Amino acid sequence: MMEQAAFTLRGRNPDVLTCIANLSNDEVFTPPEFANRMLDTLAAAWAKDNVGANLWADKSVKFLDPCTKSGVFLREIASRLTQGLAVEIPDLQERVDHILTKQVFGIGITHLTSLLARRSLYCSKHANGKHSIAKGFASEAGNIWFERMEHTWLDGKCAFCGASQKTLDRGEELETHAYAFIHTDDIRARIAELFGGNMQFDVIIGNPPYQLDDGGYRSGVWVGCLVGWCRAVARHSTVCIDGVPSAATWRPLPWPCPKSCSAVGGLMR
């Protein structure tokens, strides 16, 4: 007979997103604790700007993470909405379907992270799979979009994000790390392509992959583009965090900030 070890993990149920190692220099996962701090700040700012309204009890608010990796922001948003909408939508399955199909959206940064984000949000890498908690999707992607994008090379760098051609022009077998949200001249058309219709968002929140190796090109060009596009697809009457309409983003202190994102101090430790 086997004897029970002196130590035990019985009763411990760790959050799997605290246990996953980072994958690459732009796939550094946001800790759930930090994501929740950002969401707390967001909810407080929303209440201040909307006469004390509870963000998590509003079934009309739409959220977007334009650079989702582990899906932690989307998962925690969905969890808060599930609690906040319990009175207005008492049936749990109806409530979950409403939140996941009409309120929470993401854009994966790589194929692998898009699957991980779907697993975090839908409990299945296939949004329409038999194990998915959402029952209203016809596609495997659900509301977390990913398709391979290509950089537009100009003088050795990407015209949109500044990434180094020497570093990332490496063939079809490897990820390009070209993010759909910023590799476009028309963000409204891109959002319509991804999610359909005249889609706009009330909250755009995420942790951009500032660690991406861009061959020494640390001017923050793509961050400025990200912030500009956030403004373009956000509703006008929405929360502002550190001067960025509807966008809760953060950047590390060493980054210089171009004129287009001069207000984006972000939420930092």
Please provide the spans of the model-predicted regions.
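SAM-dependent methyltransferase catalytic region
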Residues: 2-269
